[in-house]
Amino acid sequence: MEQAWRWYGPKDPVSLSDIRQAGATGIVTALHHIPNGEIWRIEEIKKRKTEIENAGLSWSVVESVPVHEEIKTQTGNYQKWINNYKQTLRNLAQCGIDTVCYNFMPVLDWTRTDLAYELPDGSKALRFDHIAFAAFELHILKRPDAEKAYSQEEQVAARTYYDKMSEQDITQLTRNIIAGLPGAEEGYTLDEFQTQLDRYKDISSEKFRTHLAYFLNEIVPVAQEVGIKMAIHPDDPPRPILGLPRIVSTIEDMQWFVETQPLPANGFTMCTGSYGVRSDNDLVKMTEQFADRIYFAHLRSTQREDNPLTFHEAAHLEGDVDMFNMVKALLNEEYRRLNQGETRLIPMRPDHGHQMLDDLRKKTNPGYSAIGRLKGLAEFRGLEMALKKVYFNK
């Protein structure tokens, strides 16, 4: 696999030099300074690509070209944003970039309630507390009809949780959920957030699928034409939240996805941490079934807690994900491609490392501090080497 690393551009506290020292060769990044929906101009792409290459690295994957909210709701200028998206793909291809990760999650890209959950060893992780999230929905946001999403027992637990919160706790939880996490292109005030949610009140999962299908049927033929692999990222967490439709969460969703737009350019980002939150997702089976459509991998693990809807980010080789067999399945597919004459390795990045050691004293992007990902990348490198020697005679 190609060892890659997510970089948030020149303002990222982790420098390109740091990344190269970590042993990565590929960069996963985006033009975060360009507003959602606007065309990525060739000169802007080339500028960022040259910056990366001057550091001895390559721009391996775009993560992400954001999908404008009006595309997701099919309102306003959605056709304009789709046409802009097509031109961005053409421009990326002209600059030699061949893989684009994106998501179709409404309003929020990914959601956590705690960005500094302290583990027993003193390191810090990201966490999603189901009851804390319920307290936010029911008593802070006060989303209409939110109680329908929770059992009576959960509502009581959420009320108890909320009653113990200080004003600072409320502010922090709200900020964690709606202010935008790394990689998210939108942040909101509480009122703006509810306004965004209201845009989806009449959009069921079935209707939302028709919106995704329309997007795919517009975009994927262009990607196929110019030689770009589109790799959709799963919902995070992979279940309905905030009354919003979530349609990239299960193996059934993956099957619908490839049947809806069967061109080879239409593929997946296998994010083990996102899919792995659900105990009914068999990650190895999902990887094997859709192996030829996996164009990018995010490798991380999560640990479900006593409440199975609550989870935290585990160490990369621990937690609920069978990382040994996951990496083995990815290598099986990679060697199949190589044996058929393909030369492109599957780009993989260690995702959401723990904040640890010296990084505990630094300002870092939540989930994207250097040392935790350095540790994860080294572990994956060792696991890959062992698997190759034992199973692939390499």
Curated annotation (Swiss-Prot):
Metabolic or biological pathway: Carbohydrate metabolism; pentose and glucuronate interconversion
Swiss-Prot/TrEMBL cofactor(s): Fe(2+); Mn(2+)
Top-level class of the enzyme under EC nomenclature: lyase
Keyword list, A-Z: Iron, Lyase, Manganese
Presence of the UniProt keyword Translocase in the record: no
GO molecular function: ferrous iron binding; manganese ion binding; mannonate dehydratase activity
Protein task: Catalyzes the dehydration of D-mannonate.
Family according to the record: Belongs to the mannonate dehydratase family.
Name used for this protein in its record: Mannonate dehydratase
Species this protein is from: Haemophilus influenzae (strain PittGG)
